[in-house]
């Protein structure tokens, strides 16, 4: 934590997953990391150590790509011993019936307008997934307490489920001056960045969060960013990834 700041928050999107590499809609499907994704996770740990940015507490989703990324990063930084808290509220956005589908094939089938509305709009969810289908989570024991979880979500739904957890559980850690690391997913982190930077619904549509590059937010006494948008620990790599993001 820099002098004069109340708290430091580090956001990290998991390393490249198997389905990121295959350009498939993933959502709540529990896929692993590619070799590249594991290397990204290791590099993120090196960046944390190089910047002497070692967290006091870790938050992750319930999905292995985030959990594995966090483990590799903290193992690399020799910082595995910190408390860990996990919640489904940090999970990726649920992509409904699109989960498991190839993005390019889906775009060709339904047209760019509908595809982009499902994928990038703030408040248009894809069609719901059918319970009991191959890529549904209704029988997953992780989600028994919430009835198997959602059947589809838009980004607005992710904001609705994540922000109360952030406010009620994570903010108290920040207010005590702890450095908090959140390892999560593209859309759950977009939801949080929208809140932190007070972005409009339209602005967040164009926001991309690269895999495996820590994003640092130093927060003031009101938990507002000292630097709007935060600071990537490898800004050149982040800019390169964002510029090449697939629509």
Curated annotation (Swiss-Prot):
Gene3D superfamilies per UniProt: Phosphoglycerate mutase-like
GO biological process: gluconeogenesis; glycolytic process
Residues annotated as site: Transition state stabilizer: 185
Catalytic residues as annotated in Swiss-Prot or TrEMBL: 14, 92
Annotated residues for binding of substrate: 13-20, 26-27, 65, 92-95, 103, 119-120, 186-187
Catalytic activity: (2R)-2-phosphoglycerate = (2R)-3-phosphoglycerate
A GO term, aspect molecular function: phosphoglycerate mutase activity
SUBUNIT field: Homotetramer, dimer of dimers.
Record NCBIfam families: pgm_1, PRK14115.1, PRK14120.1
Function per UniProt: Catalyzes the interconversion of 2-phosphoglycerate and 3-phosphoglycerate.
Family: Belongs to the phosphoglycerate mutase family. BPG-dependent PGAM subfamily.
The name this protein goes by in its record: 2,3-bisphosphoglycerate-dependent phosphoglycerate mutase
The species this protein was found in: Mycobacterium leprae (strain Br4923)
